[in-house]
């Protein structure tokens, strides 16, 4: 996969989150993908990843959007890092935090999504 194709995959992956399209997110992930949440939980396989994302996509935490600030891709290793601001609209008003995802990609699919956030404590439970 060349650099432009990898960057495009990361953009489409992020856009699927912003479109609240869980099926679109999962379509870009390998069957045996791993998603490590910033609070430490590790989800292995699409079924576990789906279960981890359902509350977010169902709107349990409010409306969520990830605005990219930086994107670094290494096509030779199939890895990308995207730094973002998560903007959240809740019943109590707007909230947000900064974070990043390290994505490992093989054969055009995300095999690992490692999420890190800039917060003192996890902001979302569940």
Regions found by a protein language model. Name each.
Residues 1-5, 36, 50-126:
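A beta-strand edge to alpha-helix "cap/lid" segment located at domain peripheries
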Residues 41-51:
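Short beta-edge strand/loop motif at the mouth of beta-sheet-based domains
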């Amino acid at each position: 996969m060349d650099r432009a194709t990898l960057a495009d995959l990361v953009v489409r992956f992020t856009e699927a989150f912003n479109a609240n399209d869980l099926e679109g997110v999962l379509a870009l992930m390998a069957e045996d993908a791993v998603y490590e949440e910033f609070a430490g939980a590790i989800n292995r396989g699409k079924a576990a990843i789906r279960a981890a994302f359902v509350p977010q996509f169902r709107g349990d935490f409010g409306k969520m959007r990830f605005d990219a600030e930086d994107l670094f891709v290494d096509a030779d290793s199939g890895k990308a890092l995207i730094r973002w601001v998560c903007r959240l609209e809740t019943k109590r008003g707007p909230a947000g935090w900064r974070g990043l995802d390290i994505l490992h990609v093989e054969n055009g699919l995300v095999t690992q999504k490692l999420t890190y956030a800039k917060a003192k404590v996890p902001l979302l439970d569940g």
